[in-house]
Amino acid sequence: MSKKKTIAFLAGGTARAAGITAHVLRKKAEKTTYKAELIEPVQPRKMGFYEKYVKRGLDVACASAAIICFSPLYIGVALLVKFKLGSPVIFTQDRPGLVDKDGRETVFKMYKFRTMTDERDENGELLPDDVRLTKFGAWLRKTSLDELAETFNILNGTMSVIGPRPQLVRDMTFMTKEQRMRHTAKPGLSGLAQVNGRNAITWDQKYIKKVGFKEDVRIILETVKKAFIKQEGISQDDMATAEDFGDYLLRTGKISQEEYQDKQRIAKQILTESGK
């Protein structure tokens, strides 16, 4: 067999293996994905050709290539987390994903490498995030290495390489319908907001109006430049644990204490009814 044929054979085999793996992971993810039924629906956005037919294939290709090429890095981070923080190595959390046909967000399990301890108070309640976040965990977040595990979310179809960053379920309940339009695009590992230096919803609203191949490539290149060349993270600057959207609205006087408590109650109910 010639060298060219060997390369073509290996490339074809790798592509088939990636496709099968993505299919299996997607079926598994469907069993843990549920819908946020307690919030009002938004109007689903019409997707273009690229977003509807091309983007998913590129996501699988990019995620598979990243896992294969950077497998030593994945293993190294996993071993460090195991040594520094113990088990589990992977942290999962429910996050709002793509809006379904009925206008309500699906909620999926997002994967991250663990950055915090499980320290609890005398009542068995977890201590605040800023207390449980270790120096090692803060470094993982600063370098965005904790985000590497999200490539498996990309493979299972709950996330994309590029798209609005997935917020917390409780953040979603505080958003207006216009702000929730960000969820009409699949959540991403990086997005327009991150390469512009801040996690602002307005950037996500701009992104959904111009989803396209050229824009995604530009954001990927900007992300590589920011995360690897400039060695900056893709999270909000100077915030190891970002402020919840509801806390921000309450702090700035944009909502009342009563509204705040009501939205928090809805968020807890969404998570509780999921069987969590």
Predicted regions and their residues:
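Membrane-penetrating hydrophobic segments
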Residues: 1-11
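Short, intrinsically disordered, charge-balanced linker/junction segments flanking boundaries
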Residues: 187, 191-199
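Positions in alpha-helical segments
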Residues: 63, 91, 134-138, 170, ...
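A hydrophobic, helix-centered structural microdomain
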Residues: 12, 17-32, 42-118, 213, ...
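Feature marks short, surface-exposed loop/turn motifs that line or immediately flank catalytic pockets
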Residues: 117-120, 158
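Acyl-group handling in specialized metabolite and lipid biosynthesis
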Residues: 204-209
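A short, polar/charged loop-to-alpha-helix boundary motif
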Residues: 119-127
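A short, structured surface patch at a secondary-structure boundary
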Residues: 127-187, 220-223
